[in-house]
Regions:
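N-terminal signal peptide c-region/cleavage motif recognized by signal peptidases
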Residues: 20-21
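Zn2+-dependent metallopeptidase catalytic core
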Residues: 83-92, 161-167, 173-193, 202-208, ...
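A surface-exposed beta-strand-loop module
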Residues: 79-146
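Beta/coil-rich, acidic/histidine-enriched accessory regions frequently appended to metallopeptidases
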Residues: 27-42, 51-58, 86, 426-577
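Juxtacatalytic substrate-recognition/specificity segment
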Residues: 218-327
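Acidic/His/Gly-enriched intrinsically disordered linker/tail segments
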Residues: 325-397
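Short, well-ordered beta-strand segments enriched in hydrophobic/aromatic residues
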Residues: 38-40, 50-69, 90, 247
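Glycine/proline-rich low-complexity spacer/linker segments in large multi-domain proteins
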Residues: 133-172
């Protein structure tokens, strides 16, 4: 149950006081799993603004001799850069009293990095840990997935990884009991349900859970599956209804495609605040979180595509066991592919909207400077540049669309959806969530040609799709395209108050008049430009005391690519879905 409490500053005295509440956690477990009792309290200031998360937990002792206590806090790198969202006011105690900790050090673990605090002595009995993590900067200099701890609509939002500091036994399953404390009239919802929850979880599964806590608005669209519900912080009622209504219809389509029971709970979480102009999403088990900038147009087809993309992640099995980002060709490629084809098949996009989305995908692939690098290489550099991250998404989607067309050309009764569902089924039955399972499905159900095509894609060979790719209503044709190139080195992100440097002599930026030392005065979302074959970029700058607008085509050179068009005159009316 939820525990109402007075709204107040949660200070260090309050944290220490929690160590006196042993009775609350006086449960004895007879099995080998350790009990982990967590209490979460959103911290608010005198103005009732959420400023951080207070965490207190009690961990029962291990029955197996341990090498020593170490607590790990994910740095969120390389996709994010922590700012103010650091561990503060950390206090650890056991049966013998306070446990002193050595200064934290950063350690790498596979593709992730952690701050690690180590105890200076062996611990004894139940372990009590308490600390506070303040909210992150609303507009960080490096914006990756929306998993960081953010204030929105008078509450808190993010993923549990944004604030959890847990023992270093990442694979150990704990018997978790999680409790929320907040004022009456407020609530918390996570990937695991509304309010408190219990279950068996390891650190990785806890980290991945998404949440909203505070004055959360709820909405259940009529006519949808009984398990589908929408929750939001910071979003006006009308906007909430608009985005929820389309999402509910898309969810029904995707749920059926991926064979998810109508009664299975599904939680669509939304956080809206002034955190930059780019809408974004993050998925978890049977849930996903959408970030919307304040005042965002919720009727945009690009938003619908994003929502459909994130739901795909949460309804099928990704290649989560792949090293680093090497599974993103599948994990993100399937999400991009099905977020276009499934809603279109259900009539949720018009023919013109579908065409625009397909050409956006094509531009992200064919105009990408990294388009010829291997999947392994792209995984290592996808967070290094402006549109580098787009490559595994777009290349994976183009590959899957090509595969679907070739299945029809080979007179197969199977579709890519059938192959993906077969892959998910094998993973659910214990197969590794890696390329091996996908290639096993291709070998068993399709044939050598499909394995060859897959290997060519993984090697970075250019994909020029077969006729019928993306359906019969669209026709693809080869064309010459320019490589996306802003023409200057810094800043990587085109953000307000950043100074331009490294303008390339002779580039389109140089020819348009952009100069080293110019100060950008407005943040620009480059994603729609990188997802276009010909959109110009317009950069407002200040040179000395003079404001100026620099406009140019951010592309260079000419290479072979493909674009799509409607199959005949009047196709928007003739193309059935």
């Amino acid at each position: 149950m939820n525990h109402p409490c007075r709204r107040h500053f949660f200070n260090f005295v309050g944290i220490v006081a929690l160590f006196c509440t042993d009775a609350l956690f006086a449960k004895t477990f007879t099995n080998a799993q350790r009990a982990l009792d967590i209490t979460l309290v959103p911290v608010v200031n005198a103005s009732n603004n959420a400023t951080g998360m207070s965490v207190h937990y009690v961990l029962s002792p291990s029955k197996v001799p341990a090498s020593g206590l170490a607590l790990m806090f994910d740095t969120l790198q390389p996709s994010l850069l922590r700012t103010s969202d650091q561990v503060t006011m950390l206090h650890v105690a056991d049966d013998k009293g306070d446990v002193a900790l050595a200064p934290p050090v950063v350690k790498q673990m596979n593709d992730r990095s952690f701050q690690v605090w180590s105890a200076t002595r062996p611990t004894s009995g139940p372990l009590h840990v308490a600390y506070v993590v303040p909210v992150a900067a609303a507009k960080p200099s490096k914006r990756g997935p929306h998993i960081d701890l953010q204030a929105a609509g008078g509450g808190l939002s993010g993923a549990f990884v944004s604030f959890l500091l847990l023992p270093d036994s990442r694979s150990e399953a704990f018997r978790v009991h999680l409790h929320w404390q907040f004022p009456a009239g407020q609530m918390a919802v996570s990937s695991n349900g509304v309010g408190d929850f219990s279950g068996e979880f390891n650190a990785s599964r806890l980290d991945d859970m998404l949440f909203l806590a505070g004055p959360v608005k709820t909405y259940s669209p009529s006519g949808n599956s009984s398990g589908f519900n929408v929750y939001a912080l910071g979003l006006p009622e009308e906007q909430l209804k608009a985005v929820a209504s389309w999402t509910a219809r898309a969810y029904e389509v995707e749920r059926k495609a991926f064979r998810v029971p109508a009664s299975q709970p599904y939680r669509f979480l939304i956080r809206s605040y002034d955190g930059g102009p780019i809408d974004s999403g993050r998925s978890s088990d049977s849930s996903f979180m959408l970030y919307l900038p304040t005042g965002f147009d919720t009727g945009r087809v690009e938003l619908h595509s994003l929502v459909a993309h994130e739901m795909v992640h949460s309804l099928m099995k990704d290649l989560d066991d792949a090293s680093g980002e090497e599974g993103d060709w599948y994990t993100e490629g399937t999400a991009d592919y099905f977020s276009k084809t499934l809603p279109r098949a259900a009539g949720l996009y018009t023919a013109q909207q579908y065409l625009d989305l397909v050409n956006e995908e094509a531009a992200q692939y064919y105009t990408n400077a990294l388009r010829d690098v291997s999947n392994k290489q792209s995984a290592n550099v996808m967070w290094s540049g402006r549109n580098a991250w787009m490559l595994p998404y777009a290349r994976g989607a183009i590959y899957l669309a090509d595969l679907d067309a070739k299945l029809r050309l080979h007179h197969s009764t199977l579709t890519v959806l059938d192959l993906v569902n077969a892959t998910s089924e094998r993973i659910e039955h214990g197969a590794p969530a890696t390329d091996t399972t996908w290639t096993g499905v291709l070998k068993d159900k399709v044939g050598v040609w499909a394995l060859t095509d897959w290997q060519h894609m993984m090697d970075g060979q250019l994909i020029m799709p077969a006729p019928g790719t993306f359906g019969t209503c669209l026709i693809g044709s080869a064309t010459k395209v320019g490589i996306f190139d802003l023409g200057f080195a810094k800043p990587i992100r085109v953000m307000a108050n950043e100074t331009v440097s490294g303008v390339v002599k002779g580039s389109n930026a140089d020819e348009a008049g952009l100069r080293n030392g110019d100060v950008i005065t407005e943040t620009i979302d480059i994603n729609p430009i990188a997802g276009s074959f010909d959109n110009l970029i317009h950069i407002p700058i200040r040179r000395g005391a003079s404001p100026m607008m620099i406009s140019y085509n951010p592309r260079s050179g000419w290479v072979t690519g493909m674009s799509w068009h409607l199959s005949s005159a009047g196709a928007p009316q003739k193309c059935s879905h």
